[in-house]
């Protein structure tokens, strides 16, 4: 689908002496209705509600719509009181449980899924929320790293000639400077393909989002490998592989003072990452390529079975995460100007 898209665009823009346009970083494919977003829940929406005898009861976050995060020019605009929605399981996951015929044939697996699902949606306590804060902060680190790499790649793969204004930009301080021009289309493709490296921020973030999506489609045959909520968080944190020292100072202080509830009872400037913590510095071509070959695999030994299941389901259902795939569009422009969709149609009546 991507190759056909490239060909169609080439045929529509081709002209004499033009440089071969590079569309790989503009086109992607997947199931647009199955994916995760860069959206968050506030603490009040997920933290357990005090019931009788001060016992924490469920705060049904899955019945609320998460809020989309915003971006400043050089940072994710997320409060320490907000955690990413794809870190939290949903009461409607494990959809296979609703198929009556399969339920009867897989009674033991069904019972295990039911037990696991109940534990997934248990109340969130202080320790749980601190874990969610820490993981969310690590996701921010990788989002910034991925965005930096993406705009760097965009810079190096842009066509070196402007068509419309007829101005030679080679002498200006822009993306068209001579030393930044790519030697060949193959070189551009090589740079872009670094995003699929095992240790690349994009690859890690996509696998985390795929993991959340996979829990909706988990099959009875794999019921024995379903993670508990704590195992799910542990798997994600291991995937991200971000040292605690790299998370922003605001979150570090919040985690250190997790016992001081007053810190989380309100939101102010202190709860958001500062400009000094989040400067964007573009990467050179050499840095991009070197980092891509730093690690062949995320894991020292064989890839965990649960993640093999996640990758199998992702390949089958083509999970698609729009804000991740087009992060520079959402970061710099807050989304697309126009979105064209396929059926089902809504028939207008007058």
Model regions and ranges:
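SAM-dependent methyltransferase catalytic region
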Residues: 1-350
């Amino acid at each position: 689908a991507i190759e056909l898209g490239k060909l169609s665009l080439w045929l529509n823009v081709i002209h004499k002496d033009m440089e071969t346009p590079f569309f790989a970083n503009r086109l992607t494919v997947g199931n647009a209705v199955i994916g995760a977003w860069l959206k968050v829940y506030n603490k009040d929406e997920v933290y357990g509600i005090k019931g009788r005898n001060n016992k924490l009861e469920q705060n049904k976050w899955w019945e609320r719509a998460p809020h989309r995060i915003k971006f400043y020019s050089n940072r994710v605009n997320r409060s320490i009181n907000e955690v990413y929605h794809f870190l939290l399981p949903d009461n409607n996951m494990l959809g296979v449980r609703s198929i009556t015929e399969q339920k009867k044939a897989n009674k033991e697996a069904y019972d295990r899924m039911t037990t696991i699902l109940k534990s997934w949606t248990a109340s969130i306590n202080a320790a749980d929320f601190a874990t969610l804060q820490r993981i969310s902060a690590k996701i921010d680190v990788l989002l910034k790293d991925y965005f930096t790499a993406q705009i760097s790649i965009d810079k190096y793969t842009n066509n070196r000639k402007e068509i419309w204004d007829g101005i030679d930009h080679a002498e200006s301080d822009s993306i068209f400077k001579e030393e930044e021009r790519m030697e060949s289309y193959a070189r551009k493709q090589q740079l872009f393909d670094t995003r699929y490296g095992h240790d690349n921020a994009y690859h890690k973030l996509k696998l985390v989002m795929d993991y959340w999506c996979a829990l909706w489609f988990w099959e009875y045959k794999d019921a024995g490998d379903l993670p508990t909520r704590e195992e799910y968080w542990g798997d994600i944190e291991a995937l991200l592989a971000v040292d605690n020292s790299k998370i922003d100072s605001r979150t570090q202080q919040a985690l250190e003072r997790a016992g001081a509830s007053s810190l989380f009872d309100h939101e102010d400037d202190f709860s958001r990452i500062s400009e000094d913590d989040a400067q964007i510095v573009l990467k050179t071509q050499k840095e991009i390529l070197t980092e891509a070959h730093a690690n062949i695999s995320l894991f020292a030994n064989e890839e965990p079975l649960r993640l093999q299941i996640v990758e199998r389901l992702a390949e089958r259902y083509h999970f698609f995460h729009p804000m991740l795939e087009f992060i520079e569009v959402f970061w710099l422009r807050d989304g697309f100007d126009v979105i064209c969709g396929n059926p089902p149609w809504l028939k207008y009546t007058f």
